[in-house]
Design a protein with these regions (language model features):
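Generic structural signal for well-ordered, non-membrane alpha-helices
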Residues: 9, 13, 44, 85-88
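Extended amphipathic alpha-helical repeat scaffolds
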Residues: 1-40, 217
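Surface-exposed polar/charged interaction patches
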Residues: 14-17, 21, 52, 56, ...
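Amphipathic alpha-helical scaffolding segments comprising HEAT/armadillo-like alpha-solenoid repeats
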Residues: 50-64, 85-99, 117-129, 148-164, ...
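Structural detector for internal amphipathic alpha-helices that build alpha-solenoid repeat scaffolds
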Residues: 29-53, 64-85, 104-117, 136-149, ...
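A general structural signal for well-ordered secondary-structure junctions
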Residues: 14-17, 21, 76, 89, ...
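Short inter-helical turns and helix N-cap capping residues of alpha-solenoid HEAT/ARM repeat scaffolds
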Residues: 101-102, 131-134, 162-163, 170-171, ...
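Alpha-helical scaffold domains
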Residues: 3-13, 17, 100, 104-105, ...
């Protein structure tokens, strides 16, 4: 454990010195490019904890530390992929990430849930309700694979819920994911929503609709 705490301290001091403007919500995840950042050493220390300790034997400090590292690894997503091989660890950290400040860990757990074959797939219903837009979007995509019978209902809800302002980035990308999920599950409502997409002034949504049409012709 001490190795993990030590590497996080070294990395955090480096990050505060070189990128003081970055935060949990404003983090591009490209820490692997940092010279002398100890990013890789920190990640290795996190993996060592996962491999050497049982998830039910660690305290909140360790859990918080692991979530911190997973969030920093949001560009490569290596640690969360390793966690898919450890059911208990994955489920523990996934649940702890819900609504936490570690938004860049939360969406990774939503995205990779299907790769953790023994994990409780119903966790996806928590992720899809996340207040963090990107987490909910990743969860909808994962739901298409894990719970296809539910995916159509959620995709349509995402399209129509009006959670984000009309014309916003968030609203457009929620609709893009909804459209792609309807296509993925071969929904009978796909054509209806392709027509809706064409009638909106969203450049990337229209482009996605055109690609979907081309793929099914």
């Amino acid at each position: 454990m001490e190795e993990l705490y030590r590497e996080i301290e070294i990395f955090s001091k480096w990050a505060e010195t070189n990128y003081p403007e970055l935060s949990e919500n404003n983090d591009n995840g490209e820490w692997e490019m940092g010279v002398n950042s100890h990013f890789y050493e920190m990640c290795d220390a996190a993996v060592n904890v996962i491999n050497e300790y049982e998830s039910n034997k660690v305290d909140e400090k360790t859990i918080d530390s692991l979530l911190f590292v997973v969030a920093r690894d949001s560009e490569c997503e290596i640690i969360v992929e390793k966690l898919t091989l450890h059911k208990e660890w994955y489920e523990l950290l996934a649940k702890k990430s819900f609504g936490s400040k570690y938004v860049n860990a939360e969406w990774q757990f939503a995205k990779h849930l299907g790769e953790c074959k023994e994990c409780d797939q119903n966790l996806i219903f928590s992720f899809i309700e996340s207040d963090y837009e990107y987490t909910s979007r990743m969860a909808l995509n994962t739901m298409a694979d894990l719970k296809p019978d539910c995916a159509e209902e959620y995709a349509i809800r995402f399209w129509n819920r009006g959670k984000y302002p009309e014309g916003s980035y968030e609203d457009e990308y929620q609709k893009i994911m909804a459209l792609n999920v309807l296509a993925k599950i071969k929904s009978k409502k796909l054509n209806e929503y392709l027509d809706k997409a064409r009638n909106l002034k969203y450049k990337w949504l229209i482009e996605n609709a055109e690609k979907i049409v081309q793929s099914i012709e």
